[in-house]
């Protein structure tokens, strides 16, 4: 499916940055309007991240117009905002395939395009990568420029300031564009600031500034006075003191939707030496009224008709596991004011909106700072509170040292509600929850649970809440639950005990998590025994012994990496018990799982009922 490009006459002339740079500057505002219109139609047909890209249209046009990409390096942070970049870098005709199996990648991806200089998906990485590229450019005397684009939300991450501190020390030429779309840093935007930014980035101002530094080098007292005077003058209209203290020359804030102002300011900044930061103000969802009014709700969207100004009504379905968690948290908080909900900037995705509204004093958004969120929970546990850290599997990776050092080592009762475990789908390898069972299982003092349905999920969350001898984790997938009838009464499960779900012959399937339904279907065809193991750690030793003693073959099934996962734990236990037995491990292979619809990926990897049955039949043949 492609669009009639004749509707976008200027965009039709800019399929690549080289073509874009041939256009007169006077047509750039029209190009931005057409690019926004194309993005609107494209995402409407394909689904995907939406509001962020609408806010970076003018910025993207200006960057590729001023900088000689791909020779000059452009590094995007996270990548939600990079759809306009993909459209302008030769992928326009394939944008309708974005996030689909075999289609355009949802984030900047090195394997996909030479214009994607660094593969991303998690936040806060851009400045570190760009700094290294700037150092490399200087070592090679390549004459190339390096630009990192980062949003104000990502600025809450510690890695960002680690990189900026290092950049200020190394003093290599690089530009950081701070895309501020939440008004969280400054409200000083307008013609005065646009004009001031162009003056401060201009050759005359910077020449005087650098010359004065040299003249005053031998007069430290006067030099310090001049420095403070400049800071106060800039501070009257710009909030750049923090960045200046880190060694950056700060310019802005300017209107990020004024493409001419962006072009002129960036042209000036190309000629500046040392680390620079350009602060721009943008509006997430710019140009589409519903997204401007609700940028969070329109952050990522299903397929929709832009002309209706509405997202399609959700089809009736079972509650998601995230919603099950959110309701459980509210139920517990009603009874215990010491229950605290902590999330690293994933309130909506983790199902915590209602909790945050009903229990604001018990809710904490730690921002995009996963390391802090984990240790924040540990501190509360020290004081007798019941912290619940709601976090995506892929983002818990970023707080792994804190999980070990600050939580498990001290046996602190922090409950981790781990969302998006297993195959996530369209967001691809940066977001698949493939590794959590493996990296948690090796940590002493951890109790790890994997529910097979939403009722087990509630009971396991309650079990973690009641457990006081160390950290617990309940790991569940993205999307709709199974439709199981929920038991309102919550009862703590005995730690490390599984449940036999079907009695069969010769083959025993040990299931971990929501693959249980597929295992039961496969078991019917194979007349196999099925156990819902429930606990990844500690394993149900007696149940494993019984299954091994009474069956010829054991099969473990999990939506996690086979290496180091629950199946590995079963093998280790059998070895300890001196019970050698053929064991088939079914799970995710030793590779990064690409993007696509979850059901497509599940089928391709043999994790649906038919795939499980076939793998077992092949193993015993």
Curated annotation (Swiss-Prot):
Q: What is its EC number?
A: 2.2.1.7
Q: Which reaction does it catalyse?
A: D-glyceraldehyde 3-phosphate + pyruvate + H(+) = 1-deoxy-D-xylulose 5-phosphate + CO2
Q: How is the cofactor bound?
A: Binds 1 Mg(2+) ion per subunit. Binds 1 thiamine pyrophosphate per subunit.
Gene Ontology biological process terms in this record = 1-deoxy-D-xylulose 5-phosphate biosynthetic process; isopentenyl diphosphate biosynthetic process, methylerythritol 4-phosphate pathway; terpenoid biosynthetic process; thiamine biosynthetic process
A GO term from the CC aspect = cytosol
Whether Metal-binding counts among this entry's keywords is yes
| UniProt-annotated binding residues for Mg(2+) | 152, 181
Q: What class of enzyme is it?
A: transferase
SMART domains xrefs: Transket_pyr (SM00861)
**Keywords (A to Z) from UniProt:** Isoprene biosynthesis, Magnesium, Metal-binding, Thiamine biosynthesis, Thiamine pyrophosphate, Transferase
A GO molecular function term, named singly, is: 1-deoxy-D-xylulose-5-phosphate synthase activity
Q: Does the keyword Membrane apply?
A: no
Required co-factor(s) are:
Mg(2+); thiamine diphosphate
Identify the metabolic or biological route this protein is part of. Metabolic intermediate biosynthesis; 1-deoxy-D-xylulose 5-phosphate biosynthesis; 1-deoxy-D-xylulose 5-phosphate from D-glyceraldehyde 3-phosphate and pyruvate: step 1/1
In this chain, thiamine diphosphate is annotated as bound at 80, 121-123, 153-154, 181, 288, 370
What family classification does the UniProt entry report for this protein? Belongs to the transketolase family. DXPS subfamily.
Xref: PANTHER family: 1-D-DEOXYXYLULOSE 5-PHOSPHATE SYNTHASE-RELATED, 1-DEOXY-D-XYLULOSE-5-PHOSPHATE SYNTHASE, CHLOROPLASTIC
Q: What does this protein do?
A: Catalyzes the acyloin condensation reaction between C atoms 2 and 3 of pyruvate and glyceraldehyde 3-phosphate to yield 1-deoxy-D-xylulose-5-phosphate (DXP).
On subunit structure and binding partners, the annotation says:
Homodimer.
This chain belongs to the protein called 1-deoxy-D-xylulose-5-phosphate synthase
Q: Which organism is it from?
A: Shewanella halifaxensis (strain HAW-EB4)
């Amino acid at each position: 499916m492609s669009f009639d490009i004749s509707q976008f006459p200027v965009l039709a002339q800019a399929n690549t940055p080289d073509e874009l740079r041939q256009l007169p500057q006077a047509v750039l505002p029209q190009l931005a309007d057409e690019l926004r219109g194309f993005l609107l139609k494209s995402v409407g047909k394909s689904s995907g991240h939406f509001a962020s890209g609408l806010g970076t249209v003018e910025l993207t046009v200006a960057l590729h117009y001023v900088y000689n990409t791909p020779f000059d390096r452009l590094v995007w942070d996270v990548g939600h905002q990079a759809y306009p970049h993909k459209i302008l870098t030769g992928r326009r005709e394939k944008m309708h395939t974005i996030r689909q199996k075999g289609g355009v990648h949802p984030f900047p991806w090195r394997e996909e395009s030479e214009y994607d200089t660094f593969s991303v998906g998690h936040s806060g990485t851009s400045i570190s990568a760009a700094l290294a590229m700037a150092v490399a450019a200087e070592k090679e005397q390549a004459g190339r420029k390096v630009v990192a684009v980062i949003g104000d939300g990502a600025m809450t991450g510690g890695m960002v300031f680690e990189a900026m501190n290092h950049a200020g020390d190394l003093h290599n030429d690089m530009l950081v564009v701070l895309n501020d779309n939440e008004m969280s840093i400054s409200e000083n935007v307008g013609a005065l600031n646009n004009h001031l930014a162009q003056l401060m980035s201009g050759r005359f101002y910077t020449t005087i500034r650098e010359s004065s530094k040299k003249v005053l080098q031998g007069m430290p007292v006067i030099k310090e006075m001049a420095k403070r005077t400049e800071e106060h003058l800039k501070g009257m209209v710009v909030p750049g003191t923090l960045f200046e203290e880190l060694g950056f020359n700060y310019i802005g804030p300017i209107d990020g939707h004024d493409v001419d102002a962006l072009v002129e300011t960036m042209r000036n900044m190309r000629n500046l030496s040392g680390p620079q930061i350009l602060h721009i103000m943008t509006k997430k969802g710019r140009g589409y009224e519903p997204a401007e009014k609700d940028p969070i709700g329109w952050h990522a969207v299903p397929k929709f008709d832009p002309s209706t100004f509405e997202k399609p009504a959700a089809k009736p379905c079972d509650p998601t596991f995230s919603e099950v968690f959110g309701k459980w948290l509210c139920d517990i908080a009603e009874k215990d004011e010491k229950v605290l909900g902590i999330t690293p900037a994933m309130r909506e995705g983790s199902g915590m909106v209602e909790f945050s509204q009903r229990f604001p004093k018990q809710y904490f958004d730690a921002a995009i700072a996963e390391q802090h969120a984990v240790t924040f929970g540990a501190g509360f546990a020290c004081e007798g509170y019941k912290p619940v850290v709601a976090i995506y599997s892929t983002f818990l990776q970023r707080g792994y040292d804190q999980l070990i050092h600050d939580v498990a080592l001290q046996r602190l009762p922090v409950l981790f509600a781990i969302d998006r475990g297993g195959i996530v789908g369209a967001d691809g390898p940066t977001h698949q929850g493939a590794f959590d069972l493996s990296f948690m299982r090796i940590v002493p003092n951890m109790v790890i649970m994997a529910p097979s349905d939403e009722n087990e999920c509630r009971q396991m969350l309650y079990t973690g809440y009641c457990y006081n001898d160390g950290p617990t984790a309940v790991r569940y997938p993205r999307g709709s639950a199974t439709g199981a009838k929920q038991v309102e009464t919550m009862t703590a499960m005995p730690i490390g005990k599984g449940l036999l779900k079907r009695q069969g012959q010769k083959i025993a399937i040990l299931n971990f998590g929501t693959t249980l339904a597929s295992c039961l279907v496969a078991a019917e065809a194979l007349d196999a025994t099925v156990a819902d193991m429930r606990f990844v750690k500690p394993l149900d030793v007696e149940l494993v012994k019984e299954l091994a003693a009474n069956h010829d073959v054991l099969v473990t099934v999990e939506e996690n990496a086979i290496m180091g996962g629950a199946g590995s734990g079963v093998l280790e236990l059998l070895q300890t018990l001196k019970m050698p037995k053929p064991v088939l491990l079914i799970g995710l292979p030793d590779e990064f799982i690409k993007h696509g619809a979850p059901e497509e990926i599940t089928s391709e990897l043999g994790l649906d009922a038919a795939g499980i049955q076939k793998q077992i039949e092949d193993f015993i043949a």
